């Protein structure tokens, strides 16, 4: 519940509208295993906030800032924005962190189906 409260407050502090909602969430992402489970959940909550209350006007940078705020303030965790950006954009991504207020990113063309792997993270 604290993470959702942090997301709502973070969205408001970044100039976005919020409101109440009910959500049932189920996942196979392993919690606390270093696989961006919190960032994945944060991006889901941002998508809900964006779609239902902000006419889908939030950027991936906005999503990442809101998620970072929630982790920094409500979990007292020194979180950056990389996990949030990676989850928001999806797929292989190249980041440029030169301007931390407006991260730049490029989606990479990565033909994973041509690799002889069972699991690719």
Please report, for each region that a protein language model flagged, where it lies by residue:
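ATP-dependent small-molecule kinase catalytic core of the GHMP/sugar-kinase superfamily
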Residues: 51-121
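Anion-binding (especially nucleotide phosphate/pyrophosphate-binding) glycine-rich loop
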Residues: 1-66
